[in-house]
């Protein structure tokens, strides 16, 4: 028997007449599903199903040519619709990708970096930064050397990745 908690789906109810039906159908196919009110906090959503690996959050990724996607119906795209599930030849992958956060969080980090850069270059405007900025190529070894040494990072900052 498969673990129904392997995949979790959270549905936020904004008042649609089909929300309950969708949740029921998801449960019927053996996937764990919860239905929450629309005004839930962002933190509660993050805590619902964090897929953590080595302290970082990840999202599932399934390419259309992966075995899982083909078993769910994309096999005809790859001219394998007549093949049994155990005879499918995958042309894609399944895995996980780092979860970087909501767009507003990413933009917040980018804006902080831009402000820092403008301060370091003495620029008051973006137009001035365009003319004063000088891009310098750093080798892979140089990037590695610029990181801290002999420290095991226990929690990465949103704007600093070691790998």
UniProtKB/Swiss-Prot annotation:
GO terms for biological process: purine nucleotide biosynthetic process. It comes from the Bacteria. One of its GO terms (molecular function) is IMP dehydrogenase activity. Transmembrane segments: none annotated. InterPro entries: Aldolase_TIM (IPR013785), Class_I_gatase-like (IPR029062), IMP_DH (IPR005990), IMP_DH_GMPRt (IPR001093). Pfam families: IMPDH. Belongs to the IMPDH/GMPR family. This is Putative uncharacterized protein HI_0221.1.
């Amino acid at each position: 028997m498969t673990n129904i908690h392997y995949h979790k789906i959270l549905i936020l109810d904004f008042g649609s007449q089909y929300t309950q039906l969708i949740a029921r159908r998801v449960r019927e196919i053996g996937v764990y599903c919860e239905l929450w009110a629309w005004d839930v906090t962002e933190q509660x959503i993050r805590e619902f199903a964090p897929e953590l690996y080595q302290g970082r959050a990840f999202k599932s990724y399934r390419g259309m040519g992966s075995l899982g996607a083909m078993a769910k119906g994309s096999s005809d795209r790859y001219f394998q619709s007549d093949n049994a599930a155990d005879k499918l030849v995958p042309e894609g992958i399944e895995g996980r990708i780092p979860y970087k956060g909501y767009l507003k969080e990413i933009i917040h980090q980018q804006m902080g970096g831009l402000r820092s850069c403008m301060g370091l270059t003495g620029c008051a405007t973006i137009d001035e930064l365009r003319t004063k900025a000088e891009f310098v190529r750093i080798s892979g070894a140089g990037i590695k050397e610029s990181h801290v040494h002999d420290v095991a990072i226990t929690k990465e900052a949103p704007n600093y990745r070691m790998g």
